[in-house]
Amino acid sequence: MMLTLTSSPEEVPVERFSFAPEVAFVPRGDLLEDVTVAPLTRPAVDGSSMQAAIFRFAPGGRLVRHPATIPQILAVLEGSGDVSGADGVSEPIAAGEAVFWAQGEEHETSSAVGLTALIIEGEDVDRFRGRP
């Protein structure tokens, strides 16, 4: 589906929604340091569907090292930061770039200046791996 943007916000219908914390895709609080999460979907159930959320890292924010519970993609929408995977080597990442983590892969994300990312998790996200 193609979306057409207009110059007037009044011309664009906007659907606002929210999920109760018990039914929203939000990681455990102990993983987040100065990171806010805006869930876009309900959690995946038994790997049968995908889940997504916007993560906003404040300057100095960090998603601490942890294993991916299911395959996931982190796509940076704005800002920049650093990511590390199973090898623990930190690499820079910036707006327009994405990283894939396999199920069980240890990883971490941080930002000294602030970063906004879309995180998509689900059994099928690995099919997008390697695409431009």
Predicted regions and their residues:
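Conserved short histidine dyad/triad with adjacent acidic residue
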Residues: A38, Q51-A68, Q103
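Short, conserved beta-strand element in jelly-roll/cupin
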Residues: R56-A58, P67-V83
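Short beta-strand His + acidic residue motifs that chelate non-heme Fe in jelly-roll/DSBH
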Residues: L63-R65, V83-S84, W101, E106-A112, ...
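A cytosolic small-molecule/anion-sensing beta-strand core signal
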Residues: L77-E78, A94, V113
